[in-house]
Amino acid sequence: HCRKEDIPLLGICYGMQLLVVEFARDVLGMDAGSEELEDDFEHLVIKQMQDQKQVEKMGGTMRLGSYTAELEGEVSEIYGAEEVVERHRHRFELNPEYENKLEAEGLEVSGRNPETGLAEFVEIGQKTFFIGTQAHPEFNSSIENPNPLYHEFLKSTL
């Protein structure tokens, strides 16, 4: 709904994953889903990270901590930088096998980890504000110093 009606949207972690699934289903017409929910979709656009597949005992095994993202597009403008460090807590990622198809229809990967190549941010630049991040910007935000994503998201709603 937000994408179609150009309503500002900020997808955080699982929210980013769901906006990718929605885009793949509605725009690309795929039977798309996330491996986190179930794996009987024809197109798993969200998959478990390779280094998480052998984890048998959960607890402290996620991709945790601060990671760098190299930025471009609107996200780079929002942060006023070409690189940012944000904190993470997840096991699933955008399946890189689908990036070209998503980007061809307008969902751009606008932030990527330089070491792993993982997609950290996605966006649709033609929209008022349509950004997803695999990170948790709330971990680096306070009343005195709000994370730029929150600041710009709220501005876009006014």
PLM features: what roles do these ranges have?
Residues 1-7, 12, 25-158:
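Amide-donor transfer/coupling interface in amidating biosynthetic enzymes
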Residues 19, 24:
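Conserved active-site segments centered on acidic
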Residues 14-16:
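Active-site loop->helix "elbow" adjoining a glycine-rich segment at hydrolase catalytic centers
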